[in-house]
Protein backbone atom coordinates (compact mmCIF):
# COMPACT_ATOMS: atom_id res chain seq x y z
CA UNK A 1 0.00 0.00 0.00
CA UNK A 2 1.65 3.14 -1.27
CA UNK A 3 0.39 6.57 -0.29
CA UNK A 4 1.76 10.09 -0.85
CA UNK A 5 5.13 10.70 0.87
CA UNK A 6 6.08 6.99 0.59
CA UNK A 7 9.66 6.33 -0.53
CA UNK A 8 10.22 3.61 -3.15
CA UNK A 9 13.23 1.91 -4.72
CA UNK A 10 13.58 2.00 -8.51
CA UNK A 11 13.70 -1.43 -10.17
CA UNK A 12 15.22 -0.40 -13.52
CA UNK A 13 18.31 1.27 -15.01
CA UNK A 14 16.66 4.58 -15.93
CA UNK A 15 19.05 6.57 -13.71
CA UNK A 16 16.83 7.12 -10.68
CA UNK A 17 17.58 5.24 -7.46
CA UNK A 18 14.83 6.36 -5.05
CA UNK A 19 11.42 7.91 -5.63
CA UNK A 20 8.87 9.58 -3.39
CA UNK A 21 5.19 9.24 -4.30
CA UNK A 22 3.39 12.58 -4.57
CA UNK A 23 0.12 11.55 -6.28
CA UNK A 24 -1.83 8.43 -7.20
CA UNK A 25 -3.25 8.53 -10.72
CA UNK A 26 -6.75 7.19 -11.25
CA UNK A 27 -9.42 8.49 -8.91
CA UNK A 28 -9.54 11.98 -7.46
CA UNK A 29 -9.12 11.03 -3.82
CA UNK A 30 -7.62 7.53 -3.75
CA UNK A 31 -5.62 6.98 -0.61
CA UNK A 32 -3.53 3.90 -1.45
CA UNK A 33 -1.87 2.51 -4.56
CA UNK A 34 -1.19 -1.18 -5.10
CA UNK A 35 0.79 -3.27 -7.62
CA UNK A 36 0.05 -2.14 -11.17
CA UNK A 37 -1.09 1.37 -10.25
CA UNK A 38 0.52 4.42 -11.84
CA UNK A 39 1.79 7.17 -9.55
CA UNK A 40 3.39 10.58 -9.94
CA UNK A 41 6.69 10.67 -8.08
CA UNK A 42 9.70 12.90 -7.53
CA UNK A 43 13.24 11.55 -7.82
CA UNK A 44 14.98 11.76 -4.44
CA UNK A 45 18.24 10.03 -5.40
CA UNK A 46 19.74 9.58 -8.87
CA UNK A 47 22.83 8.20 -10.59
CA UNK A 48 25.13 11.01 -11.80
CA UNK A 49 25.41 11.76 -15.53
CA UNK A 50 22.18 9.96 -16.51
CA UNK A 51 19.07 11.23 -18.29
CA UNK A 52 17.00 11.49 -15.09
CA UNK A 53 18.09 13.93 -12.38
CA UNK A 54 17.23 14.58 -8.76
CA UNK A 55 14.01 16.56 -8.07
CA UNK A 56 12.56 15.66 -11.47
CA UNK A 57 8.85 14.72 -11.52
CA UNK A 58 8.14 11.41 -13.29
CA UNK A 59 5.45 8.77 -13.70
CA UNK A 60 6.06 5.29 -12.34
CA UNK A 61 4.23 1.98 -12.08
CA UNK A 62 4.38 0.05 -8.81
CA UNK A 63 5.84 -3.45 -9.22
CA UNK A 64 6.59 -4.56 -5.63
CA UNK A 65 5.02 -3.76 -2.26
CA UNK A 66 5.66 -4.97 1.28
CA UNK A 67 1.91 -5.40 1.69
CA UNK A 68 0.92 -8.90 0.59
CA UNK A 69 -0.83 -9.52 -2.74
CA UNK A 70 -3.57 -12.18 -2.70
CA UNK A 71 -4.26 -14.12 -5.88
CA UNK A 72 -7.50 -15.88 -6.84
CA UNK A 73 -5.88 -19.31 -6.40
CA UNK A 74 -5.17 -18.54 -2.72
CA UNK A 75 -1.47 -17.77 -3.12
CA UNK A 76 -0.08 -14.81 -1.18
CA UNK A 77 2.96 -12.90 -2.49
CA UNK A 78 4.94 -10.53 -0.29
CA UNK A 79 8.11 -8.61 -1.22
CA UNK A 80 10.88 -7.19 0.94
CA UNK A 81 10.69 -3.66 -0.45
CA UNK A 82 8.46 -1.14 -2.19
CA UNK A 83 9.65 -0.69 -5.77
CA UNK A 84 8.52 1.04 -8.95
CA UNK A 85 9.59 1.36 -12.59
CA UNK A 86 9.80 4.78 -14.26
CA UNK A 87 7.57 5.00 -17.35
CA UNK A 88 6.79 7.59 -20.03
CA UNK A 89 3.36 8.99 -20.91
CA UNK A 90 2.57 5.97 -23.13
CA UNK A 91 3.38 3.44 -20.40
CA UNK A 92 6.70 2.23 -21.81
CA UNK A 93 9.63 1.87 -19.38
CA UNK A 94 12.37 4.51 -19.61
CA UNK A 95 15.07 2.00 -18.70
CA UNK A 96 16.19 -0.94 -20.81
CA UNK A 97 16.66 -3.42 -17.93
CA UNK A 98 14.53 -4.45 -14.97
CA UNK A 99 15.94 -5.70 -11.65
CA UNK A 100 14.21 -8.21 -9.39
CA UNK A 101 11.05 -10.25 -9.66
CA UNK A 102 7.96 -8.76 -11.32
CA UNK A 103 4.41 -10.04 -10.63
CA UNK A 104 2.25 -11.54 -13.38
CA UNK A 105 -0.59 -9.12 -12.48
CA UNK A 106 1.05 -6.34 -14.53
CA UNK A 107 -0.14 -8.12 -17.70
CA UNK A 108 -3.80 -7.33 -17.00
CA UNK A 109 -2.92 -3.63 -16.60
CA UNK A 110 -1.26 -3.50 -20.03
CA UNK A 111 2.42 -3.35 -19.00
CA UNK A 112 3.54 -6.21 -21.26
CA UNK A 113 6.75 -4.41 -22.27
CA UNK A 114 7.91 -4.45 -18.63
CA UNK A 115 7.13 -8.17 -18.36
CA UNK A 116 9.06 -8.94 -21.55
CA UNK A 117 12.31 -7.42 -20.24
CA UNK A 118 11.92 -8.73 -16.66
CA UNK A 119 14.38 -11.45 -15.59
CA UNK A 120 11.80 -13.23 -13.42
CA UNK A 121 8.01 -13.13 -13.53
CA UNK A 122 6.12 -14.52 -10.53
Swiss-Prot record:
* Top-level taxon in the UniProt lineage: Eukaryota
Signal peptide residues are none
The record's section on SMART domains has: Ribosomal_L14 (SM01374)
Q: Name one GO molecular function term.
A: structural constituent of ribosome
GO annotations of cellular component type: chloroplast; cytosolic large ribosomal subunit
Give the matching InterPro entries: Ribosomal_uL14, Ribosomal_uL14_bac-type, Ribosomal_uL14_sf
Keyword Chloroplast listed? The answer is yes
The alphabetized list of GO BP terms reads:
translation
Transmembrane domains' residue ranges? none
Where does the protein principally reside? plastid
CDD domains, per the entry: Ribosomal_uL14
Q: Where in the cell is it found?
A: Plastid, Chloroplast
Keyword match Cell wall biogenesis/degradation? no
Key words, A-Z: Chloroplast, Plastid, Ribonucleoprotein, Ribosomal protein, RNA-binding, rRNA-binding
Concerning its family, UniProt says: Belongs to the universal ribosomal protein uL14 family.
**What HAMAP family has UniProt attached to this entry?**
Ribosomal_uL14
| PANTHER family given in the database record | 50S/60S RIBOSOMAL PROTEIN L14/L23, LARGE RIBOSOMAL SUBUNIT PROTEIN UL14M
Q: How does it assemble?
A: Part of the 50S ribosomal subunit.
Q: What task does this protein carry out? A: Binds to 23S rRNA.
Name of the featured protein? Large ribosomal subunit protein uL14c
Source organism phylogeny = Eukaryota, Viridiplantae, Streptophyta, Embryophyta, Tracheophyta
Amino acid sequence: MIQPQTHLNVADNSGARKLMCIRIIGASNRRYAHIGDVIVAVIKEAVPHMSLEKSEVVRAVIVRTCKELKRDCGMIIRYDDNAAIVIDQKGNPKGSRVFGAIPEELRQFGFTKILSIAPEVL
